[in-house]
Curated annotation (Swiss-Prot):
NCBIfam families given in the database record: F420_cofC (TIGR03552)
Pfam families the record matches: CofC
Enzyme Commission code: 2.7.7.68
Gene3D superfamilies documented for this protein: 6.10.140.50, Spore Coat Polysaccharide Biosynthesis Protein SpsA, Chain A
Protein family per UniProt: Belongs to the CofC family.
Quaternary organization: Homodimer.
Keyword terms: GTP-binding, Nucleotide-binding, Nucleotidyltransferase, Transferase
Name of the encoding gene: cofC
Organism field: Methanosarcina mazei (strain ATCC BAA-159 / DSM 3647 / Goe1 / Go1 / JCM 11833 / OCM 88)
UniProt name for this protein: 2-phospho-L-lactate guanylyltransferase
Pathway: Cofactor biosynthesis; coenzyme F420 biosynthesis
Length: 208
């Protein structure tokens, strides 16, 4: 099996712009990417590909193979799946709470497809045993769409429901979860800029 991580560093994570500058966001997404790669390698996945529209930020990448594709996310991934001859795990790059243990559990499914839902109806990971028979359609309520795609193509699927694997970092409030539950370089980076504070019974971020 192999894993593929869609990734774009330039202008990344615009929804974090209220709390992080462009430079900080680009530094942060690179740290998250490296943690995801480390988790994949820790789970025993030797072949890790990064699918990106640009080499920006990946010039010195040695832990994964960089594949350039300027097409949109769905077109690029569907081309990748069509050419794959072994099971594929698609993992988003903004999952710093994802562990090797999660990855092992996801990829050990007895079903044809394992779908990891993200917040707001998204899809954080997809394990596909027969990639040439499956297509992806991200954006919008992609989790429901990916369930339907599996059913319509005659493939049974499992839903891997996990808080940690389901926590993608998109909004400022997601950084709270990273500080509470995370570890590693991505957490350390945010911890160098913010502290947690309880206000009106809710935990929030306060700049240092």
């Amino acid at each position: 099996m192999r894993a593929v991580i869609p990734y774009k560093k330039a202008g990344a994570k615009s929804r974090l712009s209220p709390v992080l500058s462009l430079q900080e966001r680009e530094e942060f997404v690179e740290l998250m990417l490296n943690q995801v790669i480390s988790s994949l390698k820790g789970a025993g996945i030797e072949q890790v590909d990064i699918l990106s529209p640009s080499v920006y930020g990946l010039e010195e990448m040695t832990e994964a193979r960089v594949l350039l594709d300027e097409k949109d996310l769905n077109e690029a991934l569907n081309r990748y799946l069509k050419e794959a001859e072994e099971p594929v795990l698609i993992v988003m790059a903004d999952l710093p709470l994802l562990s090797p243990e999660h990855i092992k559990e996801i990829s050990s499914t007895e079903k044809d497809v394992c779908i990891v839902p993200g917040k707001g109806g998204g899809t954080n990971a997809l394990f596909i045993k027969n990639p040439s028979k499956y297509r992806v359609k991200y954006y919008g309520s992609s989790f429901l769409t990916h369930c339907s795609i599996a059913t319509d193509s005659g493939q049974d699927f499992e839903i891997y429901d996990s808080f940690m694997a389901g926590t993608d970092i998109d909004e400022p409030e997601d950084l709270v979860e990273l500080l509470i539950h995370g570890k590693g370089a991505a957490k350390d980076y945010i911890e160098s800029k913010f502290r947690l504070e309880v206000k009106k019974g809710r935990v929030g971020l306060v700049p240092l």
